[in-house]
Amino acid sequence: EVHPNGIAIDKLGNIFFSDSGGSKLYKIGRDRVITAIAGTGDFNDSGDGGLALNAGLRSPGGLAIGPDEALYVAEQTTHRIRKIDSNGIITSYVGNGIFGYAGDGGPAVKANIKNPFRMKFDKVGNLYFSDRDNNRIRKVDVNGVITTIAGHSNIGWLQDGLEVRITVHNFP
């Protein structure tokens, strides 16, 4: 049973989607043929530095195509965002796998995040993502440094007129 979650389309028109229940990523080519591109189907966190097809994925969700044409996947239950390059190699890009909030001003790959959900790159190459269970929007700049853009730990609702770092978010 397939549970489609995230979706992304590259500049060639290939469609990528995550199967959160099956712990895999798929590509639908322009010829409409579906091919698995990442994940063994096992619900585990493994394979960094190796082929994405041999890697374990846990709850893959949001997807984004980076300016480098790599595919980025938010793994909600491993608290990471991983990158799959054009050679099919998977590496951690954001998050150290520790459930929590820490790391602003330092390397994104060493930061604690909680349940990354959706993400988007800007024109310059900065990555913005919802750090959902931390109630924050965070940014990874082109140098790999993570910062918080909006939100804080208290659960609440958006409030018009407040500076974004003060405004409370409830699972962005």
Kindly give the residue locations of the regions a language model identified.
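Conserved beta-propeller blade signature
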Residues: 14-16, 70-72, 126-129
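A short loop-to-beta-strand structural motif that recurs across blades of beta-propeller domains
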Residues: 23-27, 33, 79-83, 89, ...
